[in-house]
Amino acid sequence: MSIIVKNLTHIYNEGMPFASKALDDVSFEIKDRDFVGLIGHTGSGKSTLIQHLNGLLKPSSGEIFINDFNITDKNLNLTEIRKRVGVVFQYPEYQLFEETIDKDIAFGPSNLGLEESEIHNRVKASMEAVGLDYEGFKDKSPFELSGGQKRRVAIAGVIAMNPEVLILDEPTAGLDPGGRDEIFNLIKDLHEKKNMTIILSSHSMDDMAKLAKTLIVMNHGSVEFMGTPREVFKSNASKLKDIGLDIPQVLELALKLREKGFDISEDILTLEEAKQEILKVVRGRGLC
């Protein structure tokens, strides 16, 4: 599904003494089946933007189009949009409540009025999609699982609704490095195998550089930069630091080496690219 955001502004407590503008004239377009990384410092407007994309918040002004649906139209029934646009919020495991994993994942599809056989098929398929064996996990309590496994169950509950767009707000928050890598690999697989449009909010610049096809950088409620990871990081490294954001570690290394006089390209995002550049410099100096 394509998403078009036009001149979106959101003011909390509008008209009140403590009014606060969280989004300021935001505009962008996301193509069908894109993988978008949404980055920005705390308070940049990322979470507020996410809540607009399936109608959880209404804008103060502006429009959002999901395919041909203007979801800011007051006369539009948002139920159909929310079936198509799934949102996984921060710490989604806190939303788990059923006594078994099977029942928890089935909760959403059950509210769609589906046949029991279809609900079963969706639960089984979504568990397998997130790497949980159905027979091995279906009767377990979600509260017996590790943090990473709980996160997988929560994501499966959204996938079971068969959304065309999956939005994830800091899905690895609070996980150890192993759990974080598992979730990022899962999201990558969902994008590749299910052809979903993915919008991923994260503070991990290294993972964003590897996963996302498009980056949207938010700053004080506005879109600061938008482009491919290579375009955004290569052209705006110093500006990103100025607004409180990191850059990928391999690019940081390249910039440090350039400061020391090494002729290292700034167009580096992966470890393999960094290795090749360093080898080129070493060989050029006759060191190997």
UniProtKB/Swiss-Prot annotation:
Record-linked SUPFAM superfamilies: P-loop containing nucleoside triphosphate hydrolases
Membrane disposition: Peripheral membrane protein
EC nos: 7.-.-.-
EC class of the enzyme, as a word: translocase
Gene3D superfamilies with a match to the protein in the record: P-loop containing nucleotide triphosphate hydrolases (3.40.50.300)
Principal localisation: membrane
PANTHER family: ENERGY-COUPLING FACTOR TRANSPORTER ATP-BINDING PROTEIN ECFA2, HEAVY METAL TRANSPORTER
Name the record gives this protein: Energy-coupling factor transporter ATP-binding protein EcfA2
